[in-house]
Amino acid sequence: MNTVKTVLELRAAVARARSEGKRIALTPTMGNLHSGHAALVSKAAQRADFVVASIFVNPLQFGPNEDLATYPRTLAADQEKLLQAGCNLLFTPGVEEMYPHGMADQTLVSVPHLSQGLCGASRPGHFEGVATVVSKLFNMVQPDLAIFGEKDFQQLAVIRAMVRDLNMPIQIIGEPTVRADDGLALSSRNGYLDEAQRAAAPALYQAIRQTAEAISAGEQDFETLLNSKKQQLQAAGFRIDYLEIRNADSLRPTTAEDPDLVILAAAFMGKTRLIDNLHLTRG
């Protein structure tokens, strides 16, 4: 596995692979990798001949009171995980490489509607930052396919819409959330949790799963169901950002007729914001 830091080096390496007829996959990350990231890269290696991963902590997607400065940078450990997972090329640009003209006047990519509400409501500008950096990476690499985790369900929806609307010839693949044995979705931010918080954190997925089970059993009073689960989460020590049931395709509020639903949640355990979701198809 080679590691490059400049767009010029990245494009040269990708061009060599493409000239050899290789199918190219991209997995963008912010580093501090866990086994969920490794699973994405392994899936990419199964679907493509040449796997590119990126590590870039993108300032554009962090709000003023978020953890940009403290987000863990663990490059050496990340390189080892990527190598073991089957990555061929790692791109680790600095901020000046990604935004050479500064961020104040950077052209931005905005995906309306899907970027609003849910995480977009509590993190203004977040998805604009995500869409912008991912579109830049797509232009730099021009992959045949890109793989993202379904844990960030709204982010995946935003990227799918961006690719569709901007006619990018890239296949977007969502991979199921990787979980710890107790159900907690793997996240780089889980490392912020202390021992007691980590023990309580699986209650988030439990509430989501119980919501899905109730709907599958025929429950139609979503408001009462969600209110009871919010109380359950608060009792477990969470401060709730949102817990909602949406149409899985449009992320609009669901109707009784929607066959394809997603239950989405974001909540704080101490100072750590955790997100999770569960996709549900009603027969």
UniProtKB/Swiss-Prot annotation:
<keyword id="KW-0436">Ligase</keyword>
<keyword id="KW-0566">Pantothenate biosynthesis</keyword>
<protein>
    <recommendedName>
        <fullName>Pantothenate synthetase</fullName>
        <ecNumber>6.3.2.1</ecNumber>
    </recommendedName>
</protein>
<keyword id="KW-0547">Nucleotide-binding</keyword>
<dbReference type="GO" id="GO:0005829">
    <property type="term" value="C:cytosol"/>
</dbReference>
<feature type="binding site">
    <location>
        <position position="61"/>
    </location>
    <ligand>
        <name>beta-alanine</name>
    </ligand>
</feature>
<feature type="binding site">
    <location>
        <begin position="30"/>
        <end position="37"/>
    </location>
    <ligand>
        <name>ATP</name>
    </ligand>
</feature>
<dbReference type="Pfam" id="PF02569">
    <property type="entry name" value="Pantoate_ligase"/>
</dbReference>
<feature type="binding site">
    <location>
        <begin position="186"/>
        <end position="189"/>
    </location>
    <ligand>
        <name>ATP</name>
    </ligand>
</feature>
<dbReference type="InterPro" id="IPR003721">
    <property type="entry name" value="Pantoate_ligase"/>
</dbReference>
<comment type="pathway">
    <text>Cofactor biosynthesis; (R)-pantothenate biosynthesis; (R)-pantothenate from (R)-pantoate and beta-alanine: step 1/1.</text>
</comment>
<feature type="binding site">
    <location>
        <position position="155"/>
    </location>
    <ligand>
        <name>(R)-pantoate</name>
    </ligand>
</feature>
<dbReference type="InterPro" id="IPR014729">
    <property type="entry name" value="Rossmann-like_a/b/a_fold"/>
</dbReference>
<feature type="binding site">
    <location>
        <position position="178"/>
    </location>
    <ligand>
        <name>ATP</name>
    </ligand>
</feature>
<feature type="binding site">
    <location>
        <begin position="149"/>
        <end position="152"/>
    </location>
    <ligand>
        <name>ATP</name>
    </ligand>
</feature>
<feature type="active site" description="Proton donor">
    <location>
        <position position="37"/>
    </location>
</feature>
<dbReference type="InterPro" id="IPR042176">
    <property type="entry name" value="Pantoate_ligase_C"/>
</dbReference>
<comment type="subunit">
    <text>Homodimer.</text>
</comment>
<comment type="similarity">
    <text>Belongs to the pantothenate synthetase family.</text>
</comment>
<keyword id="KW-0067">ATP-binding</keyword>
<dbReference type="GO" id="GO:0015940">
    <property type="term" value="P:pantothenate biosynthetic process"/>
</dbReference>
<keyword id="KW-0963">Cytoplasm</keyword>
<dbReference type="GO" id="GO:0005524">
    <property type="term" value="F:ATP binding"/>
</dbReference>
<dbReference type="GO" id="GO:0004592">
    <property type="term" value="F:pantoate-beta-alanine ligase activity"/>
</dbReference>
<feature type="binding site">
    <location>
        <position position="61"/>
    </location>
    <ligand>
        <name>(R)-pantoate</name>
    </ligand>
</feature>
<comment type="function">
    <text>Catalyzes the condensation of pantoate with beta-alanine in an ATP-dependent reaction via a pantoyl-adenylate intermediate.</text>
</comment>
